[in-house]
UniProtKB/Swiss-Prot annotation:
Protein name: Cruciferin BnC1
Assembly and oligomerization: Hexamer; each subunit is composed of an acidic and a basic chain derived from a single precursor and linked by a disulfide bond.
Residues bearing PTM Phosphotyrosine: Y330
InterPro entries: 11S_seedstore_CS, 11S_seedstore_pln, Cupin_1, RmlC-like_jellyroll, RmlC_Cupin_sf, Seed_Storage-Functional
Phosphoserine PTM positions: S332
Gly residues composition bias: residue spans: 122-148
Length: 490
């Protein structure tokens, strides 16, 4: 009994110590008296583009537990495969291209049809990706017989003109939101004529990130000559790809290649960075262009696995918006009900597009931090903290970032012809509460509570409670515009 008591006392002391250590890591990190519209603090230049990194040590980003990155890929630019130790949610702010990801342990479901042609057969549809996740039947047991299959593929490459097989490749375009698990390698290629701009939020505070709160890209190819300049206290030196750390002899044995080729994999003399320019055609197996949004179908719970999970959805189609008013704009949300993979990432997104003088009614995030990135236009934004202080009151414009901590109230009003933004939220099913409007917190209070709480008459309380009949979007031209009865359409 005494031994059990001692063990419990030790466990309790250890728990208190660990809790205290965690709390002291960033004391009062969310006691924010002022927010700022943030610009990138570091720019990593490459041959065919650049990577812009925001300072994740900024108090408002540190409070939210996230970092933010913008990738600008020029035409024919290839962002070489890399992965992070954190969950990542990305948004295509501009342009179009291709995106590929490699999920550990999953089979190559995109393949040249000539792979399966008999020796004397005439290949049909060569170079076209079958790309059907339903081909899993043809790949059963692939993991067990993979090395043997590689040998067969080597023979086929000599006798049948075998080209390639790889994991899923998708077309991406403006408005696409892309969810990526930790450890999943990802690459992008710009096959359009304008720059491909992708912004990403990395959830550094995620339970899946077992490292510290620093964004750490792991490069499978390419390099970063400037080094990880955003990590404080680290000696700055060029960041190489992870193959560079192994000896060429080890790589030669692992890949069954000669030492000279193994040295090429290490990119030691390559200063192109991690976004390179492709010379000539970029021939990968790709599917046909997809429709605006996948058709909703009934599922039995077995169709989607980690290998076949859908990881993209487009938020730029007003016909799929959650809130839509032709004269004001629209708001679309993306959560784990729309994209089940977000349940594991514990992230979600909101896309907004409003016209000049339209206003998003005052609201706060009930269960998530939010990071707002402006993709087009300008808006006047006010943010109020838990102390009732206005911690931000100013303009945000294209390319700027504003972090809005959980519970902080915010109102947005478009000051340009059109204001468009994307918000990333640190909850798979983020919830908002509004201060004004048909579904607001004040609408749910009794008149007597409002009257006594604000020391106003019952008639004034009635106007406060019922005058705004919209739920999310309204005009900001002043009370005079609400003189007559209107139809509740938002």
């Amino acid at each position: 009994m005494a031994r059990l008591s001692s063990l419990l006392s030790f466990s309790l002391a250890l728990l208190i110590f660990l809790h205290g250590s965690t709390a002291q890591q960033f004391p009062n990190e969310c006691q924010l008296d002022q927010l700022n519209a943030l610009e990138p603090s570091h720019v990593l230049k490459a041959e065919a583009g650049r990577i812009e990194v925001w300072d994740h040590h900024a108090p408002q980003l540190r409070c939210s537990g996230v970092s933010f990155v913008r990738y600008i890929i020029e035409s024919k630019g290839l962002y070489l495969p890399s992965f992070f130790s954190t969950a990542k949610l990305s948004f295509v702010a501009k342009g179009e291209g291709l995106m590929g990801r490699v999920v550990p342990g999953c089979a190559e479901t995109f393949q040249d049809s000539s792979v399966f042609q008999p020796s004397g057969g005439s290949p049909s549809g060569e170079g076209q990706g079958q790309g059907q996740q339903g081909q899993g039947q043809g790949h059963q047991g692939q993991g067990q017989g993979q090395q043997g299959q590689q040998g067969q593929q080597g023979q086929q490459s000599q006798g049948q003109g075998f080209r390639d097989m790889h994991q899923k490749v998708e077309h991406i375009r403006t408005g696409d939101t892309i969810a990526t698990h930790p450890g999943v390698a990802q690459w992008f290629y710009n096959d359009g004529n304008q720059p491909l701009v992708i912004v990403s939020v990395l959830d550094l505070a995620s339970h899946q990130n077992q490292l510290d709160r620093n964004p750490r890209p792991f490069y499978l190819a390419g390099n970063n000559p400037q080094g990880q300049v955003w990590i404080e206290g680290r000696e700055q030196q060029p960041q190489k790809n992870i193959l560079n750390g192994f000896t060429p002899e080890v790589l030669a044995k692992a890949f069954k290649i000669d030492v000279r080729t193994a040295q090429q994999l290490q990119n030691q003399q390559d200063n192109r960075g991690n976004i390179i320019r492709v010379q000539g055609p970029f021939s990968v197996i790709r599917p046909p262009l997809r429709s605006q949004r996948p058709q909703e179908t009934e599922v039995n719970g077995l169709e989607e696995t980690i290998c076949s999970a859908r990881c993209t959805d487009n938020l730029d189609d007003p016909s799929n918006a959650d809130v839509y008013k032709p004269q004001l704009g629209y708001i679309s949300t993306l959560n784990s009900y729309d994209l089940p993979i977000l349940r594991f990432l514990r992230l979600s997104a909101l896309r907004g597009s409003i016209r000049q003088n339209a206003m998003v009614l005052p609201q706060w995030n009930a269960n998530a931090n939010a990071v707002l990135y402006v993709t087009d236009g300008e808006a006047h934004v006010q943010v109020v903290n838990d102390n009732g202080d206005r911690v931000f009151d100013g303009q945000v414009s294209q390319g700027q970032l504003l972090s809005i901590p959980q519970g902080f109230s915010v109102v947005k009003r478009a000051t340009s012809e059109q204001f468009r933004w994307i918000e990333f939220k640190t909850n798979a099913n983020a919830q908002i509460n509004t201060l004004a409007g048909r579904t607001s917190v004040l609408r749910g209070l009794p008149l007597e509570v409002i009257s006594n709480g604000y020391q106003i008459s019952l008639e004034e309380a009635r106007r406060v409670k019922f005058n705004t009949i919209e739920t999310t979007l309204t005009h900001s031209s002043g009370p005079a515009s609400y003189g007559g009865p209107r139809k509740a359409d938002a």
